[in-house]
Amino acid sequence: MSQTPQQFHIQAKVALKDPQLRANFRGAMDYLRDKRKTAFSDAKEEKAIRDLAESIRQRCLSKLPTLLEQLEQKCSQNGIYVHWAENPEQANGIIAEIAQRHQARMIIKGKSMVSEEIEMNHEMAKLGIECLESDMGEYIVQLDGDKPSHIIMPAIHKNKQEVSDTFEKNLDGFTPTLDVDELIQTGRTRLRQKFHDADIGLSGVNFAVAETGTLCLVENEGNGRMSTTIPKVHIAITGIEKVVEYLADVPPLYSALTRSATGQAITTYFNMITSPRKKGEKDGPREVHLVLLDNGRSQAYQDEEMRKTLQCIRCGACMNHCPVYTKIGGHAYGTVYPGPIGKIISPHLLGLEATKDLVTASSLCGACGEVCPVRIPIPELLQRLRREAKHDAKSGNTVMEGQKAAHSNLESMAMTSFAFAATHPTFYHSATGLTTKMQALIPNKLGAWTQCRTAPKPASKTLHQLLKEKQTMADDHSGNKSSKDKS
């Protein structure tokens, strides 16, 4: 059964009952958090990096329409074909047209979350075009008929034994092993010839530079470089928000990205593509296409508050520090982008009605906002989306026209009742006092919260009563002391 955001609560329960999954994530999350902590060991340096990254992203977003036009102009001058796609259907149509024009039977893919967003593999398969993942994590989950569970490390939910089992099941002649180097070498060996066999190479884009028309790709495995240089045709696909103004904007963002994602000062490979192969050059594609996808991004851009979601540089740090994601993993969310960032991006892509359960799946602890390298105020945006999801248009906080979710009358009544009690002290004190006297009648199971916890027993005395008694004792003590002094 495929996961969907509408089934989040069911999927989360299934994940929580899987001890192996939780163990896999516990080890992986601890590792990634430690790596980031080491990379940002100097608090002043961390602040400086994040300050600069935030200011660059905000500046670039403030000029987004102009920068996109400039990017198109520069790319066209460089010989890169630029295509605009309003939605996944248009994006897949563009890619399909290019593939069919070149009579392509295989597309070799570098890392691309946007290709997951548009379900490109599935759509190309309908046309008889094979899409083969070359990122090792993506390759593993593709072999298993699975989906990525993390935007940086797609197979993070699998341990060595599970990877070995996947290879044994899908690769002829594979000898089971738990040696990580051997597992990686097996994947590389099977993929190497595929780069030469592929008719088209496809990649994502980390930064698209408007000043020069340059496409920047960040990676550690070398598959991105091979998939963009060996095939005769290269297609790069990215969201419209990835544009930056100047080439000088890239190094600060690159530093913030790598440190936050994997704890590295720099990645093993950093690719810059400015044109197809020129006369006299020995490698590189003969044709380069850039597909710029909207898919709800321009709608978010029009909202001054929700525009901040477009600052994201896809590092995954918020996921690694989220107490919800680290317990249930990415599949439970049922969306391409899981975790905290997914909760505020997915409503633009799928609508708030479909994703309303995700925005409440948060403790609002603020850890995601504290580690975000571009300082997206994720907790505040989640609260904004919660208001919209629960109160519909009645709250006066319309997030995105046409994407409002239904509100719960029962929950609204409960919140209204609490607000009344909290603003009327006499009523509040009477109600809490009555609760302590009737605690024997309160059931042990109080909804979903107590399905995995023991409901706490109300104290025999309320805080107000304890404070009153303490004040009385203090007054008595003060009075006794005063009497002794007089005598």
Give a label for each model feature:
Residues 70, 74, 78, 94-98, ...:
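Generic, well-ordered alpha-helical scaffold segments in large soluble proteins
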Residues 137, 265-269, 398-400, 409, ...:
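Short coil/turn segments at secondary-structure boundaries
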Residues 245-247, 261-266, 320, 379-382, ...:
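Acidic/polar loop patches that form or flank catalytic/metal-binding clefts of enzymes
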